[in-house]
């Protein structure tokens, strides 16, 4: 999913050369997975990748100051709860940086990031419920097939794009499941 997410973002921000990730450090398995996948994808796309770890919300200012010194072009905000559930604390730093940003959840784009691309959480919860019903009905968990997400949500925050002077290509507008005004 990191490849698709970064590929869509690259189409929105074609001049991207240096991407910074804002996320918890030391990170959980989710943050480490996001970081490793982004590092790999950035290398494949020829981008420089920088990680700006935060232990707590009070570290955001320092992380963004470091990113300013490193002259990053854009930000990926981790889906970790530290950042994703505290977007009201993250967005002011993103806005002040005047850099495009993206994250893994629709709610992050709704909060002000330029875009998000993720599996549809509602669909995932529905599938989890169906699995639970099968298990409660007597099915052995080991006998159930592993399913991957099949429904994804691509959101573009048009208001943020305008504020950053980014013209969203018509091809991306056509792909977007949600356009936030």
Functional labels for PLM-detected ranges:
Residues 1-181:
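Short hydrophobic alpha-helices and adjacent helix-cap/hinge residues
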């Amino acid at each position: 999913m990191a490849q698709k997410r970064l590929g869509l973002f690259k189409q929105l921000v074609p001049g991207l050369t240096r991407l910074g990730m804002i996320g918890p450090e030391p990170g959980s398995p989710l943050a480490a997975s996001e970081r490793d996948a982004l590092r790999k994808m950035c290398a494949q796309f020829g981008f420089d990748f920088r990680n700006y770890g935060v232990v707590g919300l009070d570290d955001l200012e320092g992380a963004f100051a470091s990113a300013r010194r490193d002259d990053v072009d854009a930000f990926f905000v981790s889906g970790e709860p530290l950042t994703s559930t505290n977007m009201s604390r993250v967005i002011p730093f993103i806005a002040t940086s005047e850099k495009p940003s993206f994250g893994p959840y629709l709610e992050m784009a709704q909060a002000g990031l330029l875009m998000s691309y993720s599996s549809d959480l509602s669909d995932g919860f529905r599938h989890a419920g169906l699995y639970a019903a099968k298990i409660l009905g007597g099915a052995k968990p080991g006998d159930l097939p592993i399913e991957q997400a099949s429904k994804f949500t691509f959101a573009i925050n048009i208001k943020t794009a305008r504020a950053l002077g980014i013209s969203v290509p018509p091809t991306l507008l056509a792909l977007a499941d949600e356009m936030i005004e």
